[in-house]
Amino acid sequence: MKAIHNWLAGIPYEHIIILANTDTYGGGGIYNSYTLTTAHHSMFRPVVVHEFGHSFGGLADEYAYDEAPSPLYPCDIEPWEPNITTLVHFEDKWKDMLEPGTPVPTKPQTDEKLIYTKVGVYEGAGYTKKGIYRPTTECRMRINEAPVFCPVCQRSLERTIRFYTE
């Protein structure tokens, strides 16, 4: 990757997206560096958008594993990513987007109209089932089937765009 960045150093560019010529599922996004995904898998489009969320917006994965190999996020430290929290410094995250009286943790939404938009504090994110929270029941940073980023991720991406354009 360093060679690619060096090669592009004299050319004005905004972001690197690398498409691998394979139908194997996968991808990765390194914040402030690049997006990598496979070009011929049926889930290419949602995966490249998800990985772009990491590499451009600094967004965290909002999914959790049944058995995380080791906690990536200690529960007594607030993650730097804007879309997950341990509640240590929640006021710096999306607390201002909660409706008054929203319970913490928030029960997952079952109404299809609300699963992508109802901002709360839903447990299970950052690869961990307990102690790490995400802003909505579902989001592009959690599942490939989500049609959009959640409101918290959208706000964060908008702030990043404004940082570079205003």
Language-model segment annotations:
Residues M1-E67:
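Active-site-proximal segment of zinc-dependent metalloprotease catalytic domains
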